[in-house]
Amino acid sequence: MTIRNQRFSLLKQPIYSTLNQHLIDYPTPSNLSYWWGFGSLAGICLVIQIVTGVFLAMHYTPHVDLAFNSVEHIMRDVEGGWLLRYMHANGASMFFIVVYLHIFRGLYYASYSSPREFVWCLGVVIFLLMIVTAFIGYVLPWGQMSFWGATVITSLASAIPVVGDTIVTWLWGGFSVDNATLNRFFSLHYLLPFILVGASLLHLAALHQYGSNNPLGVHSEMDKIAFYPYFYVKDLVGWVAFAIFFSIWIFFAPNVLGHPDNYIPANPMSTPPHIVPEWYFLPIYAILRSIPDKAGGVAAIALVFISLLALPFFKEMYVRSSSFRPIYQGIFWLLLADCLLLGWIGCQPVEAPFVTIGQISSVFFFLFFAITPILGRVGRGIPKYYTDETHRTGSFWP
């Protein structure tokens, strides 16, 4: 190839060379398992949500008198509208399933540890943005659960000292959840996914600065292979499995993950017997309800994200992977069971014994983050590969 041809080659252009560096020639540890495929699946879910959301917005009307009917118009009159709506509604659930698995994989293999602190913190920010985006999106159909869910959750801001009531009034655009609230939520719901894209790109760039973690929790620059074609094929298998799983929900059980009360138009004069959020909010909602005081519940929710953000800054552990840490491994599986229990408690009535079970489960949830630094020092004697300040070398802890 001549110098002139090299200059005008597509692969030599900055954007293509960047894509080639991060998606094709990206050096990847050779022992990655299928658990490392959820990052790309999360990206696919985000693209699905944006594409379907843009088309749904073309037919949606953000007005309290027309929102519910416009959703029904999409379902009944727009060609393929039912598919767009079911893909978008169930796509949110799939997105959270993938991200929850991604988070628990990171906890199991300690992917938050040095030098990937920034990667983990960006991931927590993305998770928080997802929660906000999904919540305001749940309000848009303007059904009973949409209206009352918005009323209950936004009212939590009143627990903030001094400025709480002002924030609630600003969120509502008035003195109750009404048309101004719906318009604000629609605007934010359209904007936030694009902010999520930017945060995801930063997350990917931060990850590729130091490379991916691996099941052994060791660091090595030698035992790496190109992402394409080796791990691209492994990811492709995961994409096909995800497409099948996603299709089952869309075509055979499109409303199972939703709430039947949301097929009733919003009525400010009639409160549902039991107000519950979408299933992916239930563990956090259970923690919120486990504390009778509103301010305490809001503080507990804030502590959930503070605990996640603080994980990378605990003292460095001797061994990263839970494969070599049986004590931590047992505690991790208890945490997973605890989160599932919190999810179940979140959809139960606020009465005994569910309140007590929720309080015990919430205590264990925070206890996990409290004892993680201690467990990180257990397991001395397991080999750890580290990076010397002057040169990369393999070594073991004595």
Swiss-Prot record:
Localization of this protein: Mitochondrion inner membrane
Pfam families under this entry?
Cytochrom_B_C (PF00032), Cytochrome_B (PF00033)
Would I find Transmembrane among this entry's keywords? yes
Query: What PROSITE patterns has UniProt attached to this entry?
Result: CYTB_CTER, CYTB_NTER
Name the needed cofactors. Answer: heme b
Q: Which CDD domains match?
A: cytochrome_b_C, Cytochrome_b_N
- General remark: Heme 1 (or BL or b562) is low-potential and absorbs at about 562 nm, and heme 2 (or BH or b566) is high-potential and absorbs at about 566 nm.
The record's comment on protein family reads: Belongs to the cytochrome b family.
Main role? Answer: Component of the ubiquinol-cytochrome c reductase complex (complex III or cytochrome b-c1 complex) that is part of the mitochondrial respiratory chain. The b-c1 complex mediates electron transfer from ubiquinol to cytochrome c. Contributes to the generation of a proton gradient across the mitochondrial membrane that is then used for ATP synthesis.
Protein name per its UniProtKB record: Cytochrome b
Question: In which organism is this protein found?
Answer: Triticum aestivum
